Amino acid sequence: MKTVILFGFLLALLGYLEAEHAQSDPEFTAKARQMLAVFGNSEVDRYTKSRNLPALIEFYEKYSSRLPLTVQDRTYANNVIRRYRAHNNQQVDGVPAQGGVGVVFALLLPFAVSIVEGIAKAIRE
């Protein structure tokens, strides 16, 4: 009897996981297209791109396993995110530091380029 219950539980779990995976595909595609529209478009200004960097980082953290990146690109991206967070967590007199968007943007630009290339490849597959 325990085997039947365990088997039923495993079937239910597999069904749930399959349904979850099927739902995430349209979400991944929609968010990937949104990131491409901002970071893959040369006509989008620098301010808009810098304003959308947190969304790109969130996208990368959520879907990094689905992006076809090299080990070197993945390591670089993780290091850049760590440095970005450290920069954003700096405080001056107890309040978050102001400005420095140019420094952060210069740091994240190669990261954004490699992620956008990975997104474009993932959408084509």
Swiss-Prot record:
Q: List the disulfide bonds.
A: none
Q: What processes does the entry annotate via GO biological process terms?
A: cellular response to heat; cellular response to UV; innate immune response; response to bacterium; response to heat; response to UV; response to virus
What induces this protein's gene, according to its Swiss-Prot or TrEMBL record?
By a variety of stressful conditions including bacterial infection, heat shock and exposure to ultraviolet light.
Q: Name one Pfam family in it.
A: Turandot
Q: Gene Ontology terms, cellular component aspect?
A: extracellular space
Signal peptide range equals: 1-19
Location in the cell reads:
Secreted
Record's keyword terms, sorted:
Immunity, Innate immunity, Secreted, Signal
Biological function: A humoral factor that may play a role in stress tolerance.
Provide the family line.
Belongs to the Turandot family.
Q: What is this protein called?
A: Protein Turandot F
Say which species the protein is native to. Drosophila melanogaster
